[in-house]
C-alpha cells in the first residue's frame, strides 16, 4: 500500500509538471507542433538516466523507495509516450506523413540519447 501512495503522489507531481510544460510550450511556440510532448519526452529520458545512475550508485534499500516514487511516479506522470502515440496517429490520419515520421523518429532518438547523457552526467556527479 505504501508503494501505491508513493506512485500516486509522484504521479500527481509529474502530471502537473507535464501539464505546465505543455501550457508553457503552447504559449511560447504555438500549436504548430507538439512541442510540450516532445520536450517532456526528451527531458524525461534525461532525468530517467540521471535517476537510474544515482540509484545504482546508492545501492541500498531506500533506493527502491526512490525508484518507485521518482521513476514510476514522477517520471511516469511526466513523460507522455501515450500522448506521443496519439499525436503521431493524428498526423498520419491527416496524411502528414513526413511530419509524423520526423516527430516520432526525433522523439525516440533524442529521448534515448538524452537518457545516455543523463547516465554520463550522473556518473560523473555521483562517482
From Swiss-Prot:
Q: Name one GO molecular function term.
A: fluoride channel activity
Q: Where does Na(+) bind?
A: 76, 79
List the catalytic activities from the record.
fluoride(in) = fluoride(out)
UniProt-listed InterPro entries: FluC (IPR003691)
Q: Pfam families in the record, alphabetically?
A: CRCB
- Topology with respect to the bilayer: Multi-pass membrane protein
Q: Which residues form the signal peptide?
A: none
**Subcellular locations according to the entry:** Cell inner membrane
Which keywords appear in this protein's UniProt record, sorted alphabetically?
Cell inner membrane, Cell membrane, Ion channel, Ion transport, Membrane, Metal-binding, Sodium, Transmembrane, Transmembrane helix, Transport
**Activity regulation:** Na(+) is not transported, but it plays an essential structural role and its presence is essential for fluoride channel function.
Chain ranges passing through the membrane: 4-24, 36-56, 72-92, 101-121
What are the BP-aspect GO terms? Answer: cellular detoxification of fluoride
Gene Ontology CC entries for this record? plasma membrane
This protein's source sits in the domain of life called: Bacteria
Function of this protein?
Fluoride-specific ion channel. Important for reducing fluoride concentration in the cell, thus reducing its toxicity.
Similarity comment:
Belongs to the fluoride channel Fluc/FEX (TC 1.A.43) family.
Name of protein: Fluoride-specific ion channel FluC
Organism of derivation: Caulobacter vibrioides (strain NA1000 / CB15N) (Caulobacter crescentus)
Instruction: Name the gene behind this protein.
Output: fluC
Amino acid at each position: 500500500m505504501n508503494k501505491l501512495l508513493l506512485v500516486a503522489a509522484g504521479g500527481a507531481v509529474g502530471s502537473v509538471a507535464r501539464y505546465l510544460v505543455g501550457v508553457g510550450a503552447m504559449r511560447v511556440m504555438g500549436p504548430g507542433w507538439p512541442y510540450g510532448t516532445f520536450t517532456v519526452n526528451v527531458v524525461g529520458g534525461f532525468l530517467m538516466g540521471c535517476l537510474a545512475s544515482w540509484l545504482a550508485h546508492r545501492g541500498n534499500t531506500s533506493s527502491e523507495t526512490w525508484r518507485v516514487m521518482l521513476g514510476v511516479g514522477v517520471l511516469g506522470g511526466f513523460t507522455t509516450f501515450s500522448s506521443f502515440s496519439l499525436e503521431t496517429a493524428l498526423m498520419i490520419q491527416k496524411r502528414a506523413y513526413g511530419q509524423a515520421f520526423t516527430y516520432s523518429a526525433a522523439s525516440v532518438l533524442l529521448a534515448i540519447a538524452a537518457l545516455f547523457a543523463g547516465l554520463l552526467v550522473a556518473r560523473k556527479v555521483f562517482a
